[in-house]
Amino acid sequence: MASLIYRQLLTNSYSVDLHDEIEQIGSEKTQNVTVNPGPFAQTRYAPVNWGHGEINDSTTVELILDGPYQPTTFTPPIDYWILINSNTNGVVYESTNNSDFWTAVVAVEPHVSPVDRQYTVFGENKQFNVRNDSDKWKFLEMFRSSSQNEFYNRRTLTSDTKLVGILRYGGRIWTFHGETPRVNTDSSHNANLNDISIVIHSGFYIIPRSQECKCNEYINNGLPPIPNTRNVVPLSLSSRSIQYKRAQVNEDITISKTSLWKECTIIRDIIIRFKFGNSIVKLGGLGYKWSEISYKAANYQYNYLRDGEQVTAHTTCSVNGVNNFSYNGGFLPTDFSVSRYEVIKENSYVYVDYWDDSKAFRNMVYVRSLAANLNSVKCTGGSYDFSIPVGAWPVITGGAVSLHFAGVTLSTQFTDFVSLNSLRFRFSKTVDEPSFSILRTRTVNLYGLPAANPNNGNEYYEISGRFSLISLVPTNDDYQTPIMNSVTVRQDLERQLTDLREEFNSLSQEIAMSQLIDLALLPLDMFSMFSGIKSTIDLTKSMATSVMKKFRKSKLATSISEMTNSLSDAASSASRSVSIRSNISTISNWTNVSNDVSNVTNSLNDISTQTSTISKNLRLKEMITPTEGMSLDDISAAVLKTKIDMSTPIGKNTLPDIVPEASEKFIPKRSFRILKDDEVMEINTEGDVFAYKIDTLNEVPFDVNKFAELVTNSPVISAIIDFKTLKNLNDNYGITRIEALNLIKSNPNVLRDFINQNNPIIRNRIEQLILQCKL
């Protein structure tokens, strides 16, 4: 049948066409091409007599720890922590809005017995009873809500670092309390936040709220070494508003010149604008299931002014280290679920590749002393509605992270037509408010930025900063150092592959089911699979050879040699004393067949992965043991053939990549079964196992011993109509034993009869399989 194509690929995937090998070397290998560098041509290296360079700065980059500043009175800025370094006992600071908020913090040294002390707060002499029986300093937060009331101690901070913090944010005043090194934050609400002022009696620092994790670190562990040196003198707070005027900083400075080469220090201010890309894939069926919500790379092009020069910039934003979340509202077809949605958190990284058309990027090949400094940015998620057919729509909303510059390297950025040497800026993250939730579900108050709507309606996020580097460039400014060739060739192919994948996926809805079943019954071989392509016979033969060569490197081809040993290991490692109920996924004793037998004991806990791996190996066993019935690979190959015929003209360079990819990705959720007398044992890639009788379709205990014996000796059958569908069909329509047996054996004629009768349950199952044929 149609899966003959995969068996033929497995058999013939080691034939090689010399022309294809040479072409592959030209497209996938890279080679450095340089201009003649004069006397340095003998060594084939760039000059090694590096000179020194200088780095000027211009764009203001917000410091993490700004200060110290002298004691003063001012209105605290919104979204900034004021970190006060108390150096004596007494009043640390006073803050009020003259209406409903009066607070003062007093410091009490260690080992103080209960005593009444006089303090001057808000111009009044007040007597507070204080006590400190610990080895650390205590900071008592005294509060009153009216000028007529008396102060009372609302919170206490016990600290050995002698640091106190206050933040104005979100209509509240936030402070620290508890004991170092495990302090917490708490807030006070007041009606008139705009008129609040603070009188600080000690030196202090200012930290942006985006760096709150650093502020916590300072409160718990003390300030870093530099601010504690005696050479740092506190400045007046007014120094923050001084406008610095500097000489031109966006400039190129020649450091040294040798023969045809020179070294230049390149300094640039930059504005980085980027956006996140995402992909939302909905499963087939009744419309209540989503397959995945994931991040993907996104390009953005824009213009901005730099010292009067119009700059055209191009950025590519990508994400690494995502966290996979899921939501399952139940197992019914009408229960809402999301199989996987990606969230970026503290352990994730965001990469932004930046290039512009200025002179700085013309010769960015031999580079040293690359440095950069960038501001931080907060990215807040928006809402995405899961439009289910009936009922109130679940909505994923919220989530935020702050991006902090963590490093810069050289990179190669690809556009549709050219590859560009660019700078890759790496950003670490801290989670921020608000949290995200999926409304009308149990998923609430989680932190991070989900991929559903990461841009929140914004066209882009923006970061400003600067970078500098020392580059080795030709002395003649009209020359340009060539970058690696042939990279663009491969990138153009990737772009064509992406377009073809999208076209293939969109065609799934257009496949006629009766046509698919008829095609799946044909013995599709290598020639007939590609004969529909508008090309000559010679091109078809060449394409078949290229497909074989690509298929040789696929996971399916490399796994076939390990299949026998893996199944043997799995069978021998099963427990010999356990019988289990089939509808409970956590009872499987199969080991992960991809591991050595010596790792059996350690891998018993990974149940879903183990059963999933076994089912993948069952596919290989089925593929090399043809049976009478139709297989899942018959459907997969038929869909592939249909899409090839329906698609726009396909290039001979793209199809060889598509076919192996289809063999791996089409129908990822597969079920396989083994028959023994009147009993069926079924296992799927999601880790579920079932055992049931053919006559009644009633479940029986899943016998691991029996399955271990059968798996190496009995034929493996694709469960095209899986157990859940069979059960649903029997409960709603009633089927005879002969019909049940034919459906269990995937008899193609019986399947076609049910489809011709427009049986909704069978049609829905086949439609779901077709919709799973995506790249």
From Swiss-Prot:
Motif range (YGL motif): 447-449
Pfam families registered for this protein in UniProt: Rota_VP4_MID (PF17477), VP4_haemagglut (PF00426), VP4_helical (PF17478)
Region Spike head: start-end pairs: 65-223
Organism expressing this protein natively: Rotavirus A (strain RVA/Human/Japan/MO/1982/G3P1A[8]) (RV-A)
Similarity annotation: Belongs to the rotavirus VP4 family.
Marked site positions, Cleavage: R230, N231, R240, S241, R246, A247
Short motif KID motif, span: 643-645
Misc remark: This strain probably does not use sialic acid to attach to the host cell.
Start and end residues of each stretch annotated as Spike foot: 509-775
Entry keyword set: Capsid protein, Coiled coil, Disulfide bond, Hemagglutinin, Host cell membrane, Host cytoplasm, Host cytoskeleton, Host endoplasmic reticulum, Host membrane, Host-virus interaction, Membrane, Outer capsid protein, Viral attachment to host cell, Viral penetration into host cytoplasm, Viral penetration via permeabilization of host membrane, Virion, Virus entry into host cell
Entry's Gene Ontology cellular component terms: host cell endoplasmic reticulum-Golgi intermediate compartment; host cell plasma membrane; host cell rough endoplasmic reticulum; host cytoskeleton; membrane; viral outer capsid
Any GO BP annotation: virion attachment to host cell
Location of the motif DGE motif: 307-309
Keyword Acyltransferase: no
Region (Hydrophobic): 388-408
Signal peptide segment: none
Protein name: Outer capsid protein VP4
Coiled coil (UniProt feature): 483-510
Disulfide bonds: C317-C379
Gene3D superfamilies to which the protein is assigned, alphabetical: 1.20.5.170, 2.60.120.200
Ranges where the record places region Spike body and stalk (antigen domain): 247-478
InterPro entries recorded: ConA-like_dom_sf (IPR013320), Rota_A_VP4 (IPR042546), Rota_VP4_MID (IPR035330), Rota_VP4_MID_sf (IPR038017), VP4_concanavalin-like (IPR000416), VP4_helical (IPR035329)
